[in-house]
Curated annotation (Swiss-Prot):
Compartmental location: Cell membrane; Cell junction, Tight junction; Cell junction; Cell junction, Gap junction
Function per UniProt: TjpP1, Tjp2, and Tjp3 are closely related scaffolding proteins that link tight junction (TJ) transmembrane proteins such as claudins, junctional adhesion molecules, and occludin to the actin cytoskeleton. The tight junction acts to limit movement of substances through the paracellular space and as a boundary between the compositionally distinct apical and basolateral plasma membrane domains of epithelial and endothelial cells. Necessary for lumenogenesis, and particularly efficient epithelial polarization and barrier formation.
Lineage of origin: Eukaryota, Metazoa, Chordata, Craniata, Vertebrata
Protein name as catalogued: Tight junction protein ZO-1
Transmembrane regions listed in the UniProt entry: none
Location of the region described as Occludin (OCLN)-binding region in the Swiss-Prot/TrEMBL record: 633-876
């Protein structure tokens, strides 16, 4: 480069360039970090030169690097590490890792005059020209710009002031020239200290550059080129911009008077234009930068510190420093740069605009200027605004980190365009300014129309002009609404001065691309949409605002909800800032909830009389809604935490958790000591935690463990410390007592109070939670989950405030001004206010909450406050939680805590890139809180406990990566159904986990496997722990929460699936609070909690609303939300609503599976999932805090509830209700045994839920719309399948109700198995599943899944799904499950759930241990199901063993049938054989796959269910798509759970499985059905049968390993396979397709539906002619609940593939049409598969689609690779 530069220079200036090397040591400064931005890198070469150097792209004014580094300096080394040919991210990382000091070696280009003694008068300009060229590249590369700038910047810097003013390159040069008569000389001034001054006063003059021939001036002869213009028409021109000068001349009205001074030396004329332009650009850019910095400096600074990493992920343009801007709000900086530059460079228009944008784009502002200059010369075209959104860096973060990011480059280009034609217009305002504005902060404010005859029109303003400044107010970074209001607010008659620039082409592009505003906001109040186009939201949700003047009117903003993975989910209308502030003020003024919070508030006031009362009030306050200091809308950007974020733990064992972390991991965690408050403060035991204390801990590279109140958390968020807030969700009061007795026997805190406080905390402050972990009192799996959650949160991106917090956090928090925190400035020092609970809490009592909450601090009396405070002490304000709305704000809580505005979501989900979207976090947070709140409302203490219990189960199951989420979700799910149900679930889960897998194991599992494991464990544990006891006890614990709900809403429960109702009831109780959200919180909290964890993992599901499905969904997603929210909103009656008014679990799951938020919707499902922790749902929770999990949880709850219920009733999940509330359970059972199967299938759906959560885009769309789109897409894809589907469409509910025998024929292993398998391959979106009353033992087994085995299997299989599928459900089981499914297909999944419960009945360890092979092969396990399903169904509360058996057989059957479809289900299904026992006739020896299933039915089945449900569910969680799709599908579908079995497995499975199936045939599997349930709405992808098929295959291998021969055989298609399903209730066959294929392959498609199966050559063994069929069904019982009145429909069809058990040597591609989203990448898809022939929801397993090589989501269809049916 130096050579090139030298050449250029010598060519132009007789000078050469040399590289000087300098080494500087930078000290990280609080607000600035190192104060530099870097660009370039191997992966981000200069867009023109291709240079890959790391270049200083920006040096912050007043920052540590000012005076030491310059723009365009090339970074040679950082702390001794070479920066040559490294990637941008690496360079950023090195800077970030450098701690407080960084030793940076740079190369700086220096121009040397060869011929002339002067260093480089001309050469300087030349060089600069060269540099400028580089800069030009830079705008895009970001690196080049940096590099160029640095060379010239040092030069330009010295003269930056003058340059800024110098409007044109000449004037700038001229000042230089004037100082040097001969030629320009390069002068470099380096400050030795920051406050040192250059001592220059610069000015710019306008000179005559050229006189055209034959012009007036030429003829006059008095003006010569090079003359300096001193006056124009009497106006002094010094420091006047060229634009202003031009305007003056244009306004001369035919007579131009000028005063000029002759420059004999013509110095200005001799200054090279290019070089000069660059210089001036640099200088002005510099100035612009400073101005911009002032605007966005904070962000910029912060970004500099931390952004490098971020920017890296973001986009090359963002560069580390730029990333700062961009993360912060690149738009803003860019605008700022633009406007300041333009102002400064009025004389040189080109430089003005570009620098600004460039600055945004590239950290270095100078570069931008240069770029502008060059662009101006080279191409005046403005980059299209659109590119801004699609910047290189953005891919990492789904959303553009900040609109400005994209804009910057545009700005640069625009500058080039704008520069030449600036105009200064002055006029007096009449009645109006007479302008119509377009654009926004992302692209600039443009004149869209000028009123004729208005002063503005007369002065020359016209359409297409960009307004750069009005009355000295910069318009470059202003949102359109502000611009309009500013103009409107100008007093009539006041003189208006508008600096504009003609940019007609840019304007045209802006109008065509419909861009304008683009910035991110986090909400800090709850809002219910007021119109169908509105978006409802909870606290902590993040939106991208794209139009602040929607429809050209003030009052509404067009915003896009940001969901999981920071993806844009749905767009709609939200109130504008002013209205939002009004609404928020009302919310904070009035009591949030109808009774509880307000009553509590007054109660606290009354209690203050005594110390005890004070303590109590403090405790209560901790749970009170936080009154935040945040504005209603907080501008946020996505950033990485550049420091170890403080950790706040809330929950009944928060004190134990803090001490355990600090004791066992002293080098990672340290408890922040509290200091006494000022004198007289009190009684409160603890004082406050000083921010300084926190900072000291952070400086030691440790997480500060804070014992603070939720208010303190909010304040920390406000101060931008963005603590990681983990909520340990208790399973029950008894669970809390048990855990505390075990963990801290000396503690005197009251378990009841701790539990109640936790419940309230979750209800009111869930939005503060970044993660929720469900506690299982049976084990300590929560600990591993806690550590994993903290690690994940730390690694996630965080939504942080765009600017510094206004004012330091007051109170006792002593925070420094650098409240930006490292998040804002990675290198910045933290300033934290004391986050001490007392200190931060709104109330004094709350303030000491941390202390009070601590066990030690409180006695029994104080127990309450003590226990709760830890939970409530710090709630993740950043985490969006539905609950929040309900009890979010209490009058009590005077001062708003620092809501983790910036980081709710991000923090919550560690796995997310940096952090979840606010909405995600909200979802996570809200899920926990809602969970609590539902419990709280119905039975605040009981409910909370229940939920907590669920959490525990989840925790145990999958503590590590997804434990917090999974735990939370599971717990939530469990809790939601009913206070006790959650309890039960937790226990089951706890039992299962400890006995079978140590929490650590579970934790360390892959996210999906973990989840599955967790679920497995959960299921198993309960069963293992105490089958009978569990049921009896669980019904109470698990059902307790439900019972309260059920009791309160017995009728409702009856209407809805019990678990669902429990959730609903939960919510209902809450519903007393006017806010449906509250309601939702009550029940959704669980779901949300679960979801929130999932959200953590999946950015998309972050939607708080989604999480709070009932309420938020409604407002948020009109179509889906309507249905979801419809029932969810009134949790009292929600359950029935979602379920097509079916009380059955199946229906319920569906409801909970609502497209919008599958998991949230079906609170029951979430609960179900957790409750039936043995079920896939349980795994789903762990699987991650994905939306699926959410869903899963609810269904789980449902399912889990059933375990207790099943105890009381074998027939349905309803038994859960029965257990908790017998009547509801019974109605459910009575309603439809089939439903139970459905419920079971939903268990797999929980994973789907997670996915759904993940796919917020789905939610925004109405289900109907999605369905239509899906169908359209489907039509092409599923043509062939359709025929088969019609014939084979299965009806899980029907199947369930029907005797499995009818469906499955034991004697017919192959044909029926095939069919069964095919049916099993039912790919359907997960839907809540009703846990079936099946033997807990069976359930346990079904849930039982060796997490390790499962995980390993997955790896072997290319996808965990495959492995899990195999392990969790053998083919034999699948058929059984299938048949059972007709009778009770859901059983399979339900079984897993029940497995939890049953596992209580039988040792969890046993189930877990045998999870894969044992389970599969465990005849005993299979045997428990033997009791006839019908009898089971009929039995309201059969003995545990009986129930267990019943469920088992049913579940096994159903699961076996749908294995292919839902891998998770597959696993569960595999256990189908047990159900087959109950129906030997039904079970027929399955084909290859069936035998394994049959073989393992007893144990295998539960194991399978567990594995599938848990691990696969987790996987399924990935898709955000589920969120929008009907919950059921999503919950069941695992995005990638497709259990794609590697060919080896297929080979073994094909023949062997068939053989094995006959073995299993001892327990005839129900007719296998593979359900490919693609919901039209959200989960078509997840439904991919391919996934299910793989699942089957995968499962088989596990089971099959022991008894499968590999000889290939054609799998017979049972005649009933194609027809049977139709008979089942709830199955409506839309289309069927069948054909005979050989090794040559082919395509089987259904034209009507667009479903197709593409069989590759070699998929079928040589010499075999295999009949293959599929049925496209609409299953009313199996599918997730949809609100048909609201037009909700499934996005994808439900596809049952057959013959069941058929394995392929090569995966076949199942294509399901869908139109869930406008853009394929905007949605996440949840795929469900089931090995159950009936496709009962219980057997549905979530398939993890996202990222799975076996699945592809296209615009119109979802492709899933399936290796078996």
């Amino acid at each position: 480069m130096s050579a090139r530069a030298a050449a250029a220079k010598s060519t132009a200036m007789e000078e050469t360039a040399i590289w000087e090397q300098h080494t500087v040591t930078l000290h990280r400064a609080p607000g600035f970090g190192f104060g530099i931005a870097i660009s370039g890198g191997r992966d981000n070469p200069h867009f023109q030169s291709g240079e890959t150097s790391i270049v200083i792209s920006d040096v912050l004014k007043g920052g540590p690097a000012e005076g030491q580094l310059q723009e365009n300096d090339r970074v040679a080394m950082v702390n001794g590490v070479s920066m040559d040919n490294v990637e941008h991210a690496f360079a950023v990382q090195q800077l970030r890792k450098s701690g407080k000091n960084a030793k940076i070696t740079i190369r700086r280009k220096k121009k040397v005059q060869i011929p002339v003694s002067h260093p480089d008068p001309d050469p300087v300009s030349d060089n600069e020209d060269d540099s400028y060229d580089e800069d030009v590249h830079d705008p895009r590369s970001g690196r080049g710009a940096l590099a160029n700038r640095r060379g010239e910047k040092s030069w330009a810097r010295d003269r930056s002031a003058s340059r800024d003013r110098s409007l044109s390159p000449r004037s700038d040069r001229r000042s230089v020239a004037s100082s040097q008569p001969a030629k320009p000389t390069k002068v470099t001034l380096v400050k030795s200290r920051k406050n040192e001054e250059y001592g220059l006063r610069l000015a710019s003059h306008i000179f005559v550059k050229e006189i055209s021939q034959d012009s007036l001036a030429a003829r006059d002869g008095n003006i010569q080129e090079g003359d300096v213009v001193l006056k124009i028409n009497g106006t002094v021109t010094e420091n006047m911009s060229l634009t202003d000068a031009k305007t003056l001349i244009e306004r001369s009205k035919g007579k131009l008077k000028m005063v000029v001074q002759r420059d004999e030396r013509a110095t200005l004329l001799n200054v090279p234009d290019l070089s000069d332009s660059i210089h001036s650009a640099n200088a002005s850019e510099r100035d612009d930068i400073s101005e911009i910095q002032s605007l966005a400096s904070d962000h910029s600074v912060r970004s500099h510190d931390r952004p490098p990493r971020r920017s890296q992920s973001r986009s090359p343009d963002q560069r580390s420093e730029p990333s700062d801007h961009s993360t912060q709000s690149p738009q803003q900086p860019s605008n700022g740069s633009l406007r300041s530059r333009e102002e400064e460079r009025m004389s040189k228009p080109g430089a003005v605009s570009t620098p600004v944008k460039h600055v945004d784009d590239h950290t270095p502002k100078a570069v931008e200027e240069v770029t502008v200059e060059k662009h101006e010369k080279q191409t005046p075209t403005l980059p299209e605004p659109k590119p801004v959104y699609a910047q290189v860096g953005q891919p990492d973060v789904d959303l553009p980190v900040s609109p400005s990011d994209g804009v910057l480059p545009n700005s640069t280009h625009e500058d080039g365009i704008l520069r030449p034609s600036m105009k200064l217009v002055k006029f007096r305002k009449g009645d109006s300014v007479g302008l119509r504005l377009a654009g926004g902060n992302d692209v600039g404010i443009f004149v869209a129309g000028v009123l004729e005859d208005s002063p503005a029109a007369k002065e020359g303003l016209e359409e297409g002009d960009q307004i750069l400044r009005v009355n000295n107010v910069d318009f470059t970074n202003i949102i359109r609404e502000e611009a309009v209001l500013f103009l409107l607010d100008l007093p009539k008659g006041e003189e208006v001065t508008i600096l504009a620039q003609k940019k007609k082409d840019v304007y045209r592009r802006i109008v065509e691309s419909d861009v304008g505003d683009s910035f991110y906001i986090r909400t800090h109040f709850e809002y219910e949409k007021e119109s169908p186009y509105g978006l409802s939201f909870n606290k902590g949700e993040v939106f991208r605002v794209v139009d602040t003047l929607y429809n050209g009117k003030l009052g509404s903003w067009l915003a896009i909800r940001i969901g999981k993975n920071h993806k844009e989910v749905e767009r709609g209308i939200v109130p504008n800032k002013n209205r939002a502030e009004q609404l928020a003020s009302v919310q904070y003024t009035l009591p949030k909830t109808a009774g509880g919070d307000r009553a509590d508030f007054w109660r606290f006031r009354g209690l203050r009389s005594s110390k005890r009362n004070l303590r109590k009030s403090r405790e209560d306050l901790s749970a009170q809604p936080v009154q935040t200091k945040f504005p209603a809308y907080e501008r946020v950007v996505l950033r990485e935490a550049g420091f170890l974020r403080p950790v706040t733990i809330f929950g009944p064992i928060a004190d134990v958790a803090r001490e355990k972390l600090a004791r066992e991991e002293p080098d990672i965690y340290q408890i922040a000591k509290s200091e006494p408050r000022d004198a007289g403060t009190d009684h409160r035991s603890s004082g406050i935690i000083r921010l300084h204390t926190i900072k000291q801990i952070i400086d030691q590279d440790k997480h500060a463990l804070l014992d603070v109140t939720p208010n303190a958390v909010d304040r920390l968020n406000y101060a931008q410390w963005y603590p990681i807030v983990v909520f340990l969700n208790p399973d029950s009061k008894q669970g809390v007592k048990t855990m505390r007795m075990r963990l801290c026997p000396e503690s005197r805190k009251s378990a009841r109070k701790l539990y109640e406080r936790s419940h309230k905390l979750r209800k009111n402050n869930h939005h503060l939670f970044t993660t929720t972990i469900n506690l299982n009192s049976m084990n300590d799996g929560w600990y591993g989950a806690l550590k994993e959650a903290i690690q994940q949160q730390q690694n996630q991106l965080v939504w942080v405030s765009e600017g510094k917090a206004d004012g330091a956090t007051s109170d006792d928090l002593d925070l420094h001004d650098d409240r930006l925190s490292y998040l804002s400035a990675p290198g910045s020092e933290y300033s934290m206010y004391s986050t001490d609970s007392r200190h931060t809490s709104d109330y004094e009592d709350t303030d000491t909450e941390g202390g009070a909450y601590t066990d030690q601090e409180l006695d029994e009396t104080l127990n309450d406050e003590v226990g709760t405070p830890p939970e409530s002490a710090i709630t993740r304000s950043s985490e969006p939680v539905r609950e929040d709305s309900s009890g979010m704000h209490h009058e009590n809580q005077t001062y708003p805590p620092y809501s983790p505005q910036a980081q709710p979501q991000a923090i919550h989900r560690i796995d997310s890139p940096g952090l979840k979207t606010a909405s995600q976090q909200k979802a996570e947070a809200s899920s926990p809180v809602p969970y609590l709140s539902p419990e709280t409302n119905p039975a605040s203490s009981a409910s909370a406990v229940k939920h907590n219990v669920n959490l525990t189960n989840v925790n145990l199951e999958e503590p590590t990566p997804a434990p917090p989420t999974s735990h939370v979700s599971q717990a939530d799910c469990l809790g939601a159904p009913s206070p006790e149900a959650p309890h039960t679930m937790l226990r089951d889960e706890g039992v299962s986990l400890p006995s079978h897998v140590d929490p650590a194991k579970v934790y360390r599992k892959e996210p999906y496997p973990e989840e599955m494991m967790r679920q497995n464990h959960i299921l198993k544990q309960p069963a293992l722990g105490h089958p009978g006891q569990r049921l009896d006890k669980e019904p109470n614990p698990a059902y307790d929460p439900q019972l309260p709900y059920v009791e309160k809403q017995a009728s409702r429960d009856l209407e809805q699936p019990p678990y669902r109702y429990e959730s609903s009831s939960y919510t209902d109780q809450f519903s007393r609070n006017y806010d449906h959200r509250l309601r939702f919180e009550d029940r959704v909290p669980t779901y949300e909690d679960q979801w929130s964890y999932y959200d953590d993992k999946q950015p998309y599901p972050t939607r708080p609303f989604d999480t709070q499905h009932p309420r938020d969904l409604d407002s948020r997603q009109h179509p889906e939300e309507a249905s979801e929210r419809g029932y969810f909103q009134r949790f009292e009656e929600p359950a029935p609503l979602p379920y097509d008014s079916r009380p059955r679990y199946e229906q319920l799951p569906r409801t909970s599976t609502l497209r919008h938020e599958e998991q949230p919707t079906s609170g029951y499902e979430v609960h179900n999932r957790y409750r039936p922790e043995a079920q896939p749902y349980a795994p789903a929770g762990p699987k991650s805090s994905e939306p699926k999990q959410y869903f899963d949880q609810y269904p789980r709850s449902y399912e889990q509830v059933p375990p207790p219920g099943f105890t009381s009733k074998t027939g349905h999940y309803e038994p859960l209700h029965g257990a908790a509330v017998v009547p509801p359970l019974i109605p459910s059972s009575q309603h439809k045994p089939e439903v139970l199967p459905s419920a079971t299938k939903p268990q797999p759906p929980p994973p789907a839920l997670t996915e759904e959560e993940e796919d917020p885009a789905m939610k925004p769309q109405s289900v109907l719309t999605r369905v239509k789109m899906f169908e359209n897409k489907r039509s092409a894809s599923l043509e062939n399948k359709k025929d088969v589907n019609d014939t084979a469409s299965f009806k899980p509910p029907e199947v369930a109700s029907k005797p499995p025998s009818a469906s499955l024929v034991g004697p017919k292993p192959v044909s029926q198995t095939q069919f069964s398998e095919h049916d099993k391959t039912l790919y359907r979106l997960p839907e809540p599943q009703k846990p079936q009353a099946k033997p807990p033992e069976d359930i346990v087994r079904s849930n039982h899944y060796d997490p390790e085995e499962d995980e390993e299997y997955y790896r072997k299989q290319l996808s965990y799904f495959d492995r899990r599928s195999f392990e969790s459900k053998p083919p034999a089981h699948i058929p059984a499950g299938h048949h059972s499914e007709p009778a009770k297909p859901v059983h399979s999944q339900s079984q897993p759930n029940f497995s939890s419960y049953s596992s209580k009945g039988k040792p969890e360890t046993d189930a877990m241990d045998r999870s894969f092979s044992e389970k599969r092969y465990d005849p005993t396990q299979a045997m428990p199901p033997p009791p006839p399903l019908p009898s089971q169904y009929s039995q309201p509360v059969p003995p545990l063993s009986n129930s267990s058996l019943h469920i088992h057989s049913k579940a096994a059957q159903s699961e076996g049938n749908s294995v292919s479809l839902d891998f998770q289900n597959s696993y569960i299904s595999k256990p189908d054989p047990p159900p087959s026992q109950s129906k030997p006739a039904t079970f027929r020896p399955p084909t290859r796959e069936d035998p394994p299933q049959t073989f393992y039915p007893q144990k295998s089945f539960p194991d399978k269910a567990s594995v599938n449900g848990a691990e696969q569910t987790q996987k399924t969680i990935t898709p955000a798509y589920n969120r929008f799709t009907p919950k059921p599908y999503t919950s069941s579908a695992r995005p990638f759970e497709r259990k794609f079995e590697s060919p080896k497995f297929n080979h073994n499975l094909l023949p062997s499985e068939t053989v094995h199936k006959p073995e299993l045939s001892s327990k005839p599997p129900p007719s296998p059905k593979t359900l490919m349930k693609a919901h039209s709405s959200t989960q078509p992808p997840e439904f991919d049968s391919g996934v299910e098929t793989f699942s089957v295959h995968t499962d088989k291998p596990k089971y099959q390993i022991n008894n499968i021969s590999t000889m290939p055989k054609a799998v017979p298609v049972s005649p009933s396979a194609v027809e049977e399903d139709e008979d089942e209730d709830g199955h409506t066959v839309v289309a069927t397709a069948r054909g005979i294929f050989n090794s040559n392959g082919g395509v089987l498609s259904s034209i009507e539906t667009g479903v197709s199966i593409i069989i590759p050559q070699g998929a079928i063994p040589e010499g075999i002619e295999q009949e293959i069929y599929f049925k496209v069904c609409r299953d009313n019982s199996i599918l997730p609940p949809l609100d048909k009145e609201k037009g909700e429909t499934l996005l994808s069809p439900l596809v049952m593939c057959g013959p069941h058990g058929l394995k392929f040597l090569k995966p076949v591609e199942l294509r399901l049409p869908h139109c869930a989203s406008m853009t394929p990448d905007g949605w996440s898809f949840a795929l469900k598969s089931s090995d159950s022939s009936s496709g009962d929801p219980k057997t549905w397993q979530n398939k993890c689609l996202p990222g799975d090589p076996n699945y592809l989501v296209g615009a119109n269809c979802v492709s899933v690779l399936i290796d078996h049916f």
